Swiss-Prot record:
Binding site for Zn(2+) 2: C314, C317, C344, C347
Cell compartments where the protein resides: Early endosome
Functional description taken from the UniProt entry: Positively regulates TLR3- and TLR4-mediated signaling pathways by bridging the interaction between TLR3 or TLR4 and TICAM1. Promotes TLR3/4 ligand-induced activation of transcription factors IRF3 and NF-kappa-B, as well as the production of IFN-beta and inflammatory cytokines.
PROSITE patterns (alphabetical): WD_REPEATS_1, WD_REPEATS_2, WD_REPEATS_REGION, ZF_FYVE
Keyword Metal-binding part of the UniProt annotation: yes
MF-aspect GO terms: 1-phosphatidylinositol binding; zinc ion binding
Transmembrane segments: none
Protein name: WD repeat and FYVE domain-containing protein 1
Swiss-Prot/TrEMBL domain comment: The FYVE-type zinc finger domain mediates interactions with phosphatidylinositol 3-phosphate in membranes of early endosomes and penetrates bilayers. The FYVE domain insertion into PtdIns(3)P-enriched membranes is substantially increased in acidic conditions. The FYVE domain is required for its function in regulating TLR3 signaling.
Native source species: Bos taurus
SUBUNIT field: Binds PtdIns3P in vitro with high specificity over other phosphoinositides. Interacts (via WD repeat 2) with tyrosine-phosphorylated TLR3 (via TIR domain) in response to poly(I:C). Interacts with TLR4 in response to LPS. Interacts with TICAM1 in response to poly(I:C).
């Protein structure tokens, strides 16, 4: 079922501790059980499984429960030991797990959506289960009565969800690339604002309530940090992945952001440095360096008897430039560009060697990651994906051992 991996500790990369195999289809969610050597998984094969580590070092399923429909999302509340499972048919089911994690009792079914559930969050304070789905809505239901309290519709599939428990603000990402901030009430909600910055569908969100930072990952392979608490509209772009960003986790104590992409890439971003905002791209009818006309500027082309050029943009200054004036490439990590991007010649000359020093580390998960979660207190990470494999990682060599007071590495 599961193999214990004996990796030689390396100071620079995550250490693979265990590999769990046995699912018959893609694993859509995997969550580490706090203070236990255990993992809860949900899969397209219609099963919920609780895996516990045995004396042999291997993980074996102590609970194996088959659902009526493929499992598409999951939330686990450890203090009350409640599991909420979203399904492909739109229903959310609640279970209660025994103290020894060997038995799981069905509590109730919530008719939350008309289509596939994409994300679930449980709020104990309000006794709400909040969820998003492919029926283009976010819904919140009362866990005491099982009744629908409210619902808000979007123009496209709602793909991911984060929630601020103190203010009852919900952040919903959708397939159009937009993030909507909602204030949820007992039976109504109000739209506070919408955030637009990605060029692809939003795949994941992470909310840090302490610094009031929202992180979003999308199919445009990029991560954006939205400084909600700063109230100045500040955003930071992070580009280092080569595929869709599927999962995020911000480590507040060490000011690091962990992101995973569908090609197996794992990135750890240093957010404890002074980063610069990427500029807005400027528009012009001619190159802002050599003043040659762009191809749609017919008048200047006629007047100067020259051929029009393609418009490009310098990633550092944002100016509209021609290919000749932006022939060089450079990384510029302080602005989030971890690999080489187009810059104009004058900006290239202004970038020093030390400016190219990476502010992130990149690692290989070696499987298609669709979901990731972390036990920050122990420095553990679990990844799962379309290859039906669940991997448990020791992240302390990468993020450090000081994540929690009294924590010591394995």
């Amino acid at each position: 079922m599961a193999a214990e991996i004996h990796s030689r500790p390396q100071s620079s990369r995550p250490v693979l501790l265990s590999k769990i195999e046995g699912h018959q289809d893609a694993v859509t969610a995997a969550l580490l059980i706090p203070k236990e050597d255990g993992v809860i998984t949900a899969s397209e094969d219609r099963t919920i499984r609780v895996w516990l580590k045995r004396d042999s070092g291997q993980y074996w399923p102590s609970i194996y429960h088959t659902m009526a429909s493929p499992c598409s999302a999951m939330a686990y509340h450890h203090d009350s030991r409640r599991i909420f499972v979203g399904q492909d048919n739109g229903a959310v089911m609640e279970f209660h797990v025994s103290e020894d994690f060997n038995k799981m009792n069905f509590i109730k079914t919530y008719p939350a959506h008309q289509n596939r559930v994409t994300a679930i969050i449980f709020s104990l304070a309000t006794e709400w289960v909040i969820s998003t789905g492919h029926d283009k809505c976010v819904s919140w239901m009362c866990t005491r009565s099982g009744n629908m309290l409210g619902r808000h519709f979007f123009s496209s599939w709602a793909s991911c969800l984060q929630y601020d428990f103190d203010t009852q603000y919900a952040f919903v990402g959708d397939y159009s690339g937009q993030i909507t901030l909602l204030k949820l009430e007992q039976s109504t909600c109000s739209v506070i604002t919408t955030l637009k910055g990605h060029e692809g569908s939003i795949a994941c969100l992470w909310w840090d309530p302490i610094q009031r930072l929202l992180f979003s990952g999308a199919s445009d392979n990029s991560v954006i940090m939205w400084d909600i608490g700063g109230r100045k509209g500040r955003t930071l772009l992070l580009q280092g992945h080569h595929d869709r960003v599927q999962a995020l986790c911000y480590l507040q104590l060490t000011r690091q952001l962990v992101s995973c992409s569908s090609d197996g890439g794992i990135a750890v971003w240093n957010m404890d440095v002074s980063r610069e905002e990427a500029p807005q791209w400027l528009e012009s009818d001619s190159c802002q360096k050599c003043e040659q006309p762009f191809f749609w500027n017919i008048k200047q082309m006629w007047d100067t008897k020259t051929l029009g050029l393609r418009q490009h943009h310098c990633r550092k200054c944002g100016q509209a430039v021609c290919g000749k004036c932006s022939s060089k490439r450079s990384s510029y990590p302080v602005m989030g560009f971890e690999f080489q991007v187009r810059v104009c010649d004058s900006c290239y000359d202004s970038i020093k060697d030390e400016d190219r020093t990476s502010l992130a580390t990149f690692h290989e998960g070696k499987h298609n990651i669709s979901h990731m979660s972390m036990d920050v207190a122990r420095g553990l990470m679990v990844t799962c994906g379309t290859d039906r494999v669940v991997k448990i990682w020791d992240m302390t060599p990468v993020v450090g051992c000081s994540l929690a007071t009294g924590f010591s590495p394995h």
